[in-house]
Swiss-Prot record:
GO biological process, one term: glycolytic process
Gene name linked to the record: glk
Binding site for ATP: 11-16
Gene3D superfamilies in alphabetical order: 3.30.420.40, 3.40.367.20
Keywords recorded for this protein, A-Z: ATP-binding, Cytoplasm, Glycolysis, Kinase, Nucleotide-binding, Transferase
Family, as annotated: Belongs to the bacterial glucokinase family.
EC supergroup of this enzyme: transferase
GO molecular function list: ATP binding; D-glucose binding; glucokinase activity
Enzyme Commission number, as recorded: 2.7.1.2
Organism listed in the record: Xylella fastidiosa (strain M12)
Superkingdom of source: Bacteria
Biological classification of the source: Bacteria, Pseudomonadati, Pseudomonadota, Gammaproteobacteria, Lysobacterales
Name of the protein this chain belongs to: Glucokinase
NCBIfam families from the UniProt entry: glk (TIGR00749)
Compartments, as annotated in UniProt: Cytoplasm
Amino acid sequence: MNAPQAPVLVADIGGTNARFALANPTLTSAPLLNDSMREFAVIEFPSLGEAAQHYLHHIGIHTTKGVFAIAGHVDGDEARITNHPWVITRTRTATMLGFDTLHLINDFVAQAMAISVLGPQDVIQIGSAKWEQFPLSAATRNYGIIGPGTGLGVGGLVIRNGRCYPLETEGGHVSFPPSTPEEIRILEILSQQFGRVSNERLISGPGIVNIHRALSEIDGIDPGPLRPQDITMRAADGDIRATRTINLFCNIFGAITGDLVLIQGAWDGVFLTGGLVPKLLNSIQHSGFRQRFEHKGRFSAIMARIPSLAVIHPHPGLLGAAVYARDTEQVPQEIKA
């Protein structure tokens, strides 16, 4: 691997996996060094700093700069992963790694920044609305981004005259809005367990299990302990309840993605990312996702013109962190050690 003279360590840290790579901020169109990517289970390390040390030792590279995208809320010097017990302190981590500069950003800030360098080969169109390609330097665009994985990430990207401004949100934690009698019953069942039910309780890996458990309770069945992959495998084998679960997941996903467009004013398109999208892509394409996405009453005709695009780039979080490293001066809230 040929590393640049001053590489930046970029990381995409979720509730399950920690992904690391190197970025060359001098490269405009492709700042991520793809052959540098490594992935580790977060459970294998007591802290993010130790995971990063392991990566740098493994590849034999020294650097003093980093951009870490965290699947959780970033509050000044501290970031908490929503679905994992790691608490990340910027100054402590920077000192542990010997960094001069360390940026902590929300993972969907990174996902949003990646949009600016995605090409047609990196996305698959869902529905008939087409994505309008454009020269970034002349663009004025509003995009939404949503992605189910261990949790549900939501963000956006505003582009003005070639400058990219990511929108950091915790939109996965807004209340789930049921739209059918079946969804109302599911909400009632999940409310007994969780009290308040957010979109993330349904549209995520654990959400697949929650939907299946609720449908099983409606049918008077005890399904026993199941993992998300067990349910998707059963659906692939034709199991009726598992198939209902995946179809309902896709339909609700479409409905809340359409809501995101209306809330953010993401009139130029919405990007679907996260670990579940590639795995469920065929189901999303052949489900009621677009129907529920577009079915917004008096705005249905407008929604029909808005593209929804599944991101198939293998590492959009790392790519976006690399773009952030390249464009730090354009992004508010620079964090330095």
